[in-house]
Regions:
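Residue-level signal for inorganic ion chemistry
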Residues: 31, 42, 146, 221, ...
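Asp-based, Mg2+/Mn2+-dependent phosphohydrolase catalytic module
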Residues: 223, 227, 231-264
Length: 264
């Protein structure tokens, strides 16, 4: 029996306008009444996720910032912070390549490292008013998220490979969309965050259904017993799916949630 549903946001749960379809809130509420928890698992930060799900924000759990912010039952279970040394290594490596543009995030700010190009406008769906800086923030700033914009989309896989070769002892690099490379500490992923939520509720992997579309969902999809992948997903992600459902534009996640609810 499914006891928990975890879903990615962009390209998965959200529609083509990056909005939560209205029926989602009722589905989360009704599933919770039947004992099925819902987890938003995303690169977006915790406060932003709560804003997206405001009508049911207190009825669900969160794996935010790609696993560095984990909340269940309203409680903070884990918060991972990038070390100052690892941030400096990441900054120095990105400076080696003219097509890479680093962004660092704390809980409420986005810092653009020495860059004022057009990518600033699409930088962070959480916080469009980003701050341009010339060096990484001071050590008293708790960095919880990093992303790299590659302004040569056709080279994104090559650049992810190069970054992995340079910094594999520190980070994992996950292409997301056509321009972005998500950066996570080596031991952190959506899967590790979800594992903590599951442990809190006493839920096993074979009791979990997860939805995703991108490489930053791969570990989570491999971890759960019932991985469902979007029709618009990356090829490699589709290969590990138990089910390939419709696209986010078709509200396929919501349709699958409704089917589960009706089967309970």
């Amino acid at each position: 029996m499914i006891k928990l549903i975890a879903s990615d946001m962009d390209g998965t749960l959200l529609d083509e306008d990056a909005r939560v379809p209205e029926e989602t809130f009722e589905l989360i509420h009704r599933l919770a009444e039947r004992g099925v928890r819902f987890v938003a698992s995303s690169g977006r930060r915790y406060d932003t996720l709560r804003w997206f799900f405001e009508p049911v924000a207190d009825e669900m759990d969160y794996v935010a910032s790609l696993g560095t912010q984990v909340y269940a039952d309203g409680r903070l279970l884990d918060r991972e912070v990038f070390s100052t040394l690892s941030v400096m290594r990441l900054f120095e490596t990105c400076q080696m390549f003219d097509c890479l543009h680093l962004a660092l995030y704390d809980a409420g700010h986005a810092f653009l490292l020495n860059d004022q190009s057009a990518y600033v406008r699409e930088l962070d769906k959480d916080l469009p008013d980003a701050i341009c800086v010339f060096d990484p923030p001071s050590p008293d700033v708790s960095i919880i998220k990093a992303s790299i914009c590659c302004d040569r989309p056709e080279q994104i896989m090559d650049m992810a490979y190069v970054l992995e070769r340079e910094l594999s002892e520190w980070f994992t690099f996950l292409p997301s969309g056509s321009r972005w490379i998500d950066v996570t500490p080596r031991h952190v992923s959506k899967a590790t965050g979800l594992e903590q939520v599951m442990r809190y509720w006493g839920i096993q992997p074979d009791e979990v259904m997860a939805f995703g579309d991108s490489m930053n969902d791969y570990a989570m999809l491999r971890y759960v017993g019932h991985p469902c992948v979007m029709a618009n997903a990356r090829y490699a992600v589709k290969q590990v799916a138990q089910h390939v459902i419709g696209s986010n534009a078709e509200h396929a996640v919501q349709a699958t949630m409704r089917e589960l609810l009706e089967s309970l």
